[in-house]
């Protein structure tokens, strides 16, 4: 398994949330989204139903806004 150096920056510009990412960053967001989409209904009712992109987790660029991707209960 190779180490991916992803770059993700989340900002708010002119009334819009903007996510800027390199290819590895976009793949990371896609992987997280795919994993959330594959949760079972019972897993979706647990804390496993979301993922944080925040500076404290070192998974976004410095100065980024926090981003949470959540599986909405269907």
Predicted regions and their residues:
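Positively charged, low-complexity terminal tracts
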Residues: 1-74
């Amino acid at each position: 398994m190779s180490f991916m150096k992803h770059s993700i920056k989340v900002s708010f510009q002119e009334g819009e949330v903007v996510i800027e990412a390199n290819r590895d960053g976009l793949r990371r967001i896609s992987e997280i989204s795919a994993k959330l989409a594959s949760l079972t209904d019972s897993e979706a009712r647990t804390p496993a139903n979301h993922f944080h992109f925040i500076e404290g987790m070192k998974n976004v660029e410095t100065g980024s806004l926090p981003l949470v991707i959540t599986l909405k209960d269907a």
